Amino acid sequence: MARFWDGCKKSIYVVLFAVVIPLSAYIFYGALDTLDGAAALQGLLHGKMVPAVLLGTSFLLGLFLLGVFRRLIPEIEKRARWAVPALIALMALLQILTVLLIRTSLRYDHLKIFDTAAALLEQDTVADTHFRSYFMKYPNNLPMCLFTYFWLRLAQLLHIPRDFWMEYVKLINIVFMNLGMWCGYRILCRHRSRGAGIRYLLLLLVNPLWYLLVEMYYTSTLSLAFSMGAIWVFDCAGRTRSRRKKYLLYFLTGILLAAGYEIRATVIITAAALLVYAALQVKSLGDLKKTGAVLAVLLGAVLALGIYGKAEERYAGFDPSETGYPTVHWIMMSFQGDGQYNSADDAYTGSFSTKEERTEADVQRLRERIGQMGPGGLLTLFRNKLRVAFSDGTDDYASLFLTMRETSPVQKYMNGSRGDYLAFYLHGYHGLLCGLVLLAFLFRAFRGKRCFLDVVSLNLCGAYLFYLIWEVDDAYSIPFMLLFLMMEAVGMELVEDGFARIQEKARTVRFAPAAAAAGLLAVFAGVAAVGRSGAPVREYAVLQDQETSRDLLLQTDFSQTFRTGKPFDHVDLWVANWDGAANDSVYELRILEEDGTVAARAEIIGAQAPCINAYTVSFARVVPEAEQTYTLEIRLTNPDCAIKTDFLYYGTGVWDMYGDGALYAPEEIPNVDLAFAVYEQK
């Protein structure tokens, strides 16, 4: 029986690496075949030039970092007692400065969650808030909303200014992200080497996403603490001799897994990875020593789920099991295009009144799509989904952080017209990461020994397989970013060992990192030359592009104030033109200074207006003598027109998206702002 069980365990490992290695190889190829976010470079590089340039950049970056790390790591190891905390503190400081100096607004689902959590401070249930329909469809985000509500209630008790609440929750995000990071460091130090743990920290230090993603505040980033924490606590439990402490740690593991699952469903993959790993540690099928550990984990999970269930019952105001979309909806939606969100599928599922009808309809449509695709179509879909979820090095940061609560000079370099530098670096870095992860998997499969880090391999394998059947998005790899970085650190350590052996035979190789640094400078000089010849640069004075409407209609006369001391010559207004060229409305736009002087004037033609997009108006450059409050007036010049244009605004009545101005229609409407942007285009 023992021999049979050993054979089963070997088979599991064979299947694991037979899956994870080819999928990682394809993801690596995909990482070298995309320039998303680098608009100027996309216009210059085509076909095989893209992977050739990115492969070269990734190689140069890896060689340069290898040289730097070889010098730094021994010094940090000697002074690890204070150097490692100092390194972590440096990264945390950079994250905090990112939040405080680049004041972006939450957007999309993130904003809905935050706004609703703020509304719960005054309302009894989510059902009483503006976004109740959203949470009725997607109750999976209710835990995140209640989590945010807890922190906002604390902010209220501590008298933290309301205008700082978005930055406040992002600081909470930093805490949870760094808890996850610390757990990864401890696991690597324990099961690989302290050097590998320090490499992991240094690789995070030079990863811009580690700072950009603190602006996100969403389930993807917060779940890092729960998934990584569960792995670390599980490991500590297995190494503890005290039975009482051991079961307490397993109990805590269950709490972390259940709480993390409620925050982000992908934590279930971590739970599955730990379960499989625990099964692989059983010496024989008759060995029941692990039963107590399993029961402790289950007890912790049941307790956490029970507590959340009571909280949901208190604050939801509806039955999520009846109103929520069925699980099969996300599977069905993923079997089209590249597997991403599709508004038509959302509307299709929402058109049915009961959950049973929605489930039956989604299952039927899923069957139809699978039948139409056939084996070849499914293979293409799976390849595309892997690339969307794991090959993109930007994690869609450019769109996630577009709305600026305060204008920042770095905005154009982060996600504006000079964003090629950052996007190109991220793609090069991601190519390096994917290559080193593949190397680590190959080494483990053919030359490595079984160890606790196999949990990481199992987790990433589960992530790959999960997104073959689930809806995907560019940002959906974020819950696994620390696991990828752990494997990247292992891969970097393997490369360094090989480099040291080569250097013993060829001393001139020691100059390779310096040559790589020179090569990187040349590459980015080329990127700079291309970028400066690209699209015009926008210097924003105001950027508030989020919209959600209530019963207010902005179709005739209204105004919006804004404050700036920067020059501007363009205004973007987000509008909805439902009738296209048949829209016969005409509006006059005027921008008034504080003394009532007309600073700019333009015309808005309804027939030329887009639908749910920005209408751009240009005029002569306005140069303020000093910072002042301007008034943007919109007036319908032909009131007898048959069709009017809808001007969009953000108006839940809870959160003020633009604190330096107000909307008047004709009286001031509190906490409501036009969806608009004011900028100078150079």
Where on the chain are the PLM-derived regions?
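Multi-pass, polyprenyl lipid-linked donor-dependent membrane glycosyltransferases
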Residues: 169-176, 199-234, 263-270, 476-481
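Loop-to-helix entry region of an early transmembrane alpha helix in multi-pass inner-membrane enzymes
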Residues: 138, 142, 157-182, 423-428
